[in-house]
Amino acid sequence: MYRDIAEIRQFYHSPLGALTVAHLHKCFREFWPDFDTTDTPLVGAGYAIPYLNKQGASLAVMSATMGGVRWPGTGPNRAVVTEDHLLPFAENSVERLLLIHAVENADYLREMMSDAWRVLTPNGRILIVVPNRRGWWSRI
């Protein structure tokens, strides 16, 4: 899969990338019905920028291995680059966490999952998007 943020961004700027965002937004709303409308902060780790609300209280966490970009393009920056297994948040501080383009590129998967669990609030929710390694998506 993608190892560089430039490749991921290029994909999301393509027609197939736009279709993917639309489809996954629909899937996310099945898991979180208020995905697009809530004021609850959403932390997106990996490369979640296409799925984050620019006007909301969302934060983007990108892996130092893949690289990072400023987000959003205007206004205060709400993106951070860190090691993929070290989320820069206090224990029990994240109510909703979206991992996308994170797990398939993780060098320390067990540690990543442990840290995700650490930062989630007791009633927090995590959504992990992982490509099927045998599916056609993994060959794009």
Predicted regions and their residues:
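Class I SAM-dependent methyltransferase SAM/SAH-binding core
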Residues: 26, 30-87
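A short SAM/SAH-binding and catalytic strip from SAM-dependent methyltransferases
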Residues: 95-110
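A short glycine-rich, Lys/Arg-flanked "PGG" loop and its adjoining helix->strand segment in the class I
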Residues: 110-125
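Surface-exposed loop/turn positions
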Residues: 38-39, 93, 124
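Class I SAM-dependent methyltransferase Rossmann-like catalytic core
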Residues: 1-34
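A short acidic, Gly/Pro-enriched loop at the edge of an enzyme's catalytic core
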Residues: 85-97
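Conserved class I S-adenosyl-L-methionine
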Residues: 125-140
